[in-house]
Structure formats: structure tokens, C-alpha cells
């Protein structure tokens, strides 16, 4: 039964052992940390390198490659989060005892096939401050993408987005429909490079909705190369055949903080392959 909590009164809470362990972190299975230790040996041996673009005592930023999950979708997955944990174990910054009380974690998410900047909190302070900055939008996020079409001027888009959970796709409308739950979106872009009927944009993600950039640009006739949900099938087939592009050319390239600091991550080789093809059209 719902009951209002009153200030100054004492309350007793009763949990099962399992629930208490989950809340306290003391119930972390040894096997989970051991699995991360095994993964960490790939870093200590030099077999694997984490693409770190910035790191201090509280936070770490990596350049996530295309195809890597940001977080686990299934228990057996190895995501960017696990690689960061293993990296910190290899450095001696994360021990089994500290793992039981606090787990470093990513602060933002990217789709599996979107590359670029992922931020993670190494400490509780780092995690809280980064999460707050992202939530309050005091850090500005910029992306790079290559789209179909010739665009020579910057533009600002407003609209409304609705997600269809069954298809994992979103719909975009310029004006808010009278029925259904539609979220306001804002997207700003400017052309960086234009050639052969294709344009590379820097996109300022002003509202961070699911699939926002991909669907918003497609809605104005400029779908991203390699986007199999919202893109041009003929364009996608051409670039898959000629440039080995198998997913959307969308990359989280730059974070800009209120104090003027910037953290950047270079685009992957797939961008260069796409431009090599475009230059020879």
C-alpha cells in the first residue's frame, strides 16, 4: 500500500538477501569479475588497445568503432562498457573490492553501427558530473555524416518524432500531430565537404532522441549513406559494393563543454573509403 514518508520518523525496510546484495553491490558474482580479468589480459599483453581519446582520474572518452555495442543487450555480450572495465583492471585502477561497491560505466549511448565518442565515469564523481552535463545539455554534441544530395548552406531543423517500438524505427513530422506521443526535436547542420552529389555534414544534435539525426535528415531528402533503416537502397547497395560500407556513415566526432574545452574523435576509415569512391564518380 502506498504511504507518504514523513520527515523525522524511522522506518525499517526488509529485503531478501539477493535484493540487498544487488543494491549494495556486495553480491557481484566472482565469475563476472574473473571474466573481466580474462578480458583485461588482452590489454596487458598488447593484443588489444582501447581507442582512448581522453582520460583523467574521473572520466574516460573512447572512439567507439562501428559494430561495437555501447552496453550489453544480452548477458553474453561484450560491449564497450566491458572493454572499459577490462582496461581499468589492466591498469590497476579497478580492483575486485572496488568493483563490488562501484562500477565505472558509460554516460552516453551510440547505436551499434554509429561510431565515435563514448564517455564513461571512472569514479562516482566523474559519472555523476558527466551524466548531469549530458542531461542538462551543458555539453554540446556534434556528429559527422555523409548524405545523399548537394547541400551548400547550413540549416536548422525543427520537428516532432515518434518511435515505433515494434519496428525500432521513428517517424518525423514537421508539425505536431494531434494524436499520439510526439517528442520535439531540433537538429542543426552545416556542410563540410561537397562533391559528386554527396555532402559531408557536421551535425549539432540539439535534442538527443533515438535515431534523430538519421531520420531527420532522411525526412528532408538527405539520407545518410549506408543507413538501411532510413536511407536510399540504391545508394546503399552502390557504396556497399564499391566502398564496403555496410552501415550508416554517422560518427560522434566532437563534445564541446561550457568552459570551451573540446574532445574530438577522428572519423573511421569507412569515411575515407566513401570519399575515394565519390571522387571517382
Indicate residue ranges for each PLM-predicted region.
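RNA pseudouridine synthases
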Residues: 1-166, 180-186, 194, 262, ...
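Short Pro/Gly-enriched beta-strand edge/turn motifs at strand-loop
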Residues: 33, 171, 183-184, 233-239
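Pseudouridine synthase
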Residues: 76-84, 196-255
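Short polybasic amphipathic segments
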Residues: 161, 254-257
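Short aromatic-glycine motifs in intrinsically disordered, low-complexity regions
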Residues: 168-180, 243-244
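Long C-terminal interaction/binding lobes of large macromolecular proteins
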Residues: 189
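Beta-rich strand-turn-strand
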Residues: 209, 269-270
Amino acid at each position: 500500500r502506498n504511504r507518504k514518508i514523513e520527515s523525522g520518523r524511522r522506518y525499517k525496510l526488509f529485503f531478501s538477501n539477493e535484493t540487498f546484495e544487488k543494491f549494495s553491490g556486495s553480491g557481484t558474482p566472482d565469475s563476472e569479475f574473473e571474466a573481466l580479468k580474462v578480458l583485461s589480459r588482452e590489454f596487458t599483453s598488447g593484443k588489444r588497445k582501447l581507442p582512448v581519446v581522453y582520460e583523467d582520474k574521473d572520466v574516460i572518452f573512447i572512439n567507439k568503432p562501428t559494430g561495437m555495442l555501447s552496453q550489453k543487450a544480452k548477458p553474453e555480450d561484450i560491449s564497450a562498457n566491458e572493454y572499459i572495465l577490462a582496461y581499468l583492471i589492466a591498469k590497476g585502477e579497478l580492483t575486485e573490492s572496488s568493483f563490488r561497491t562501484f562500477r565505472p560505466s558509460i554516460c552516453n549511448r551510440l547505436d551499434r553501427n554509429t561510431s565515435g565518442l563514448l564517455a564513461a565515469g571512472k569514479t562516482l564523481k566523474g559519472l555523476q558530473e558527466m551524466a548531469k552535463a549530458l542531461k542538462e545539455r551543458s555539453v554540446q554534441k556534434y556528429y559527422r555524416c555523409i548524405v545523399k544530395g548537394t547541400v551548400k548552406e547550413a540549416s536548422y531543423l525543427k520537428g516532432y518524432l515518434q518511435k515505433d517500438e515494434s519496428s525500432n524505427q521513428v517517424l518525423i513530422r514537421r508539425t505536431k500531430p494531434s494524436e499520439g506521443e510526439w517528442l520535439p526535436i531540433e537538429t542543426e547542420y552545416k556542410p563540410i565537404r561537397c562533391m559528386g552529389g554527396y555532402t559531408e555534414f557536421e551535425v549539432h544534435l540539439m535534442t538527443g532522441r533515438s535515431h534523430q539525426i538519421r531520420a531527420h535528415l532522411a525526412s528532408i531528402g538527405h539520407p545518410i549513406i549506408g543507413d538501411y533503416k532510413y536511407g536510399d537502397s540504391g545508394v546503399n547497395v552502390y557504396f556497399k559494393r564499391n566502398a564496403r560500407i555496410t552501415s550508416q556513415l554517422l560518427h560522434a566526432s566532437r563534445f564541446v563543454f561550457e568552459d570551451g574545452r573540446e574532445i574530438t574523435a577522428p572519423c573511421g576509415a569507412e569515411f575515407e573509403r566513401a570519399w575515394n569512391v565519390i571522387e571517382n564518380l
